[in-house]
């Protein structure tokens, strides 16, 4: 007898007539008049539960088995047999059922066997992984993360752990969470009456990172190809389906790479991870296509078989101005494209993923390489049909004098970035990279509309429960 995951039983990795033990939770119990009960037992290893067939001859049948309800945890031992019923190939003829844990009051159990609204599930985020939806999201999230690591490892990249606490604002937007151990009831003040951060833990103002990019660049300029993957934080007071205060970001950085290299890397990476999900999570993707977004599988299949289009920002604006469509947000050269503009380009004009590049410098970050025209920077956004922007990146400014001028234009103190500037003083090289919001990627793959439902415990304005 061996303990096996439910997935091994259902996917035929266990021989018929072999005795096994599965451990998990009851999804449903059905009793027949013939004195047989059918337990659907899941353990999270795959989408479907395994059916355990339990005869009333078991010694604890009346006292325990007949009282099992949704959510009870059980240890079931029995023989794997071919299932005569429709829906699954194998089931377990139980010879022993142990109850590991009861649900105290089945009538008040938040995850009782009925459909719950997605909004309700956010209120019980500690229990929602037990649902079909959130369980499937969690497995897809895992598969995407593993596929990203695999892709970069196979491409010769090194994973670099960049700090979560920083003194630098990568985006220059100032929407950062402050990290401090100062007594808020008795803040130290300097001669000017301002808070004296010299007395703080780090001896200066410190924040939660908005990006690992600047730190990542330092390692790319020594190891050639690196990526960072971890949590990032934005103190944006945005209550939308696309924003989180804490989210995960993947950021590769490559030395001796220009914007074209960057675009090729982004395309190869996305196609790799989408193929991985289609191959490795077929059961979960089938659920998403049936219950969440009927286009979920077909969208990914189209994506991996389609070449990316490319268009300059200037030409993209011209396309939008000439298209005859009325947008909520006006289109003109110099405007940051909104989601409706991005989706029109990807879904209606190009009908394919599209890389928009060479944006006006005024709407992009200080570290993006200034183009020869002096008006645009070597920035790119990857737009995907169905969602809009999914990746943002650029070739970085490797020329110290130009970088300093851009910082001055944007009102940044170059002394705060002394170490970043050093990269341009000691063996500078062209280099490029991009950022991928991991939760937006998961939302795109699954068809789940709100990023709050693809991260285990969402952090949003006025919400840091659990």
UniProtKB/Swiss-Prot annotation:
Catalytic reaction equation(s): tRNA(Asn) + L-asparagine + ATP = L-asparaginyl-tRNA(Asn) + AMP + diphosphate + H(+)
EC number: 6.1.1.22
GO biological process: asparaginyl-tRNA aminoacylation
Keywords recorded for this protein, A-Z: Aminoacyl-tRNA synthetase, ATP-binding, Cytoplasm, Ligase, Nucleotide-binding, Protein biosynthesis
Kinase as UniProt keyword: no
Transmembrane segments annotated in the record for this chain: none
Subcellular location: Cytoplasm
SUPFAM superfamilies named in the record: Class II aaRS and biotin synthetases, Nucleic acid-binding proteins
InterPro entries linked: Aa-tRNA-synt_II, aa-tRNA-synth_II, aa-tRNA-synth_II/BPL/LPL, Asn-tRNA-ligase, Asp/Asn-tRNA-synth_IIb, NA-bd_OB-fold, NA-bd_OB_tRNA
Coarse class of the protein's main subcellular location: cytoplasm
UniProt similarity note: Belongs to the class-II aminoacyl-tRNA synthetase family.
PANTHER family reported for this sequence: ASPARAGINE--TRNA LIGASE, MITOCHONDRIAL-RELATED, ASPARTYL/LYSYL-TRNA SYNTHETASE
Subunit structure: Homodimer.
Listed HAMAP family: Asn_tRNA_synth
Full protein name: Asparagine--tRNA ligase
Gene for this chain: asnS
């Amino acid at each position: 007898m061996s303990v096996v995951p439910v997935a091994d039983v259902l996917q035929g990795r266990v021989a018929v007539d072999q005795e096994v033990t599965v451990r998990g939770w009851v999804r449903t119990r059905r009793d027949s008049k013939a004195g047989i009960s059918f337990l659907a037992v899941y353990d999270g290893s795959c989408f479907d539960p395994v059916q355990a067939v339990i005869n009333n001859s078991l010694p604890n049948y009346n006292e325990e088995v007949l009282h099992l309800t949704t959510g009870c945890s059980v240890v079931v031992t029995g023989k794997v047999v071919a299932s005569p019923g429709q829906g699954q190939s194998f089931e377990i003829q139980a010879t022993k059922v142990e109850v590991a844990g009861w649900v105290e009051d089945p009538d008040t159990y938040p995850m009782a066997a009925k459909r719950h609204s997605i909004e309700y599930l956010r209120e019980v985020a500690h229990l929602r992984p037990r649902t079909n939806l959130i369980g499937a999201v969690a497995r897809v999230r895992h598969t995407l993360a593993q596929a990203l690591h695999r892709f970069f490892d196979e491409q010769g990249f090194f994973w670099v752990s960049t700090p979560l606490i920083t003194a630098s604002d990568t985006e220059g937007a100032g929407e950062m969470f402050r990290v401090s151990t100062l007594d808020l009831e008795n803040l130290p003040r300097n001669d000017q009456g301002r808070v004296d951060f010299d007395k703080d833990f780090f001896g200066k103002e410190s924040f939660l990172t908005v990006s690992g990019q600047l730190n990542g660049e330092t390692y790319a300029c020594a190891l050639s190809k690196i990526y960072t993957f971890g949590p990032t934080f934005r103190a944006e007071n945005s209550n939308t389906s696309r924003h989180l205060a804490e989210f995960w970001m993947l950021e590769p950085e490559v030395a001796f790479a220009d914007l074209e290299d960057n675009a090729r890397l982004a395309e190869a990476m996305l196609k790799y991870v989408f193929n991985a999900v289609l191959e490795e999570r077929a059961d979960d993707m089938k659920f998403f296509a049936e219950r969440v977004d009927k286009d979920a599988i077909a969208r990914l299949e189209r994506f991996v078989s389609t070449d990316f289009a490319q268009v300059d920002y200037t030409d993209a604006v011209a396309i939008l101005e000439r298209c005859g469509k009325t947008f909520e947000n006006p289109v003109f050269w110099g405007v940051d494209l909104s989601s409706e503009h991005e989706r029109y380009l990807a879904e209606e004009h190009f009908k394919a993923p599209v890389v928009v590049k060479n944006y006006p410098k005024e709407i992009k970050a200080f570290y993006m390489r200034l183009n020869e025209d002096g008006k645009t920077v070597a920035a790119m956004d990857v737009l995907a049909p169905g969602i809009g922007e999914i990746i943002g990146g650029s070739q970085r400014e490797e020329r110290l004098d130009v970088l300093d001028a851009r910082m001055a234009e944007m009102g940044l103190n170059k002394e705060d970035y002394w170490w970043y500037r050093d990269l341009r003083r000691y063996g500078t090289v062209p280099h490029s990279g991009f950022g991928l919001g991991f939760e937006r990627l998961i939302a795109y793959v699954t068809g789940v509309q709100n990023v709050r439902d693809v991260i285990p415990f969402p952090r949003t304005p006025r919400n840091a429960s659990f």
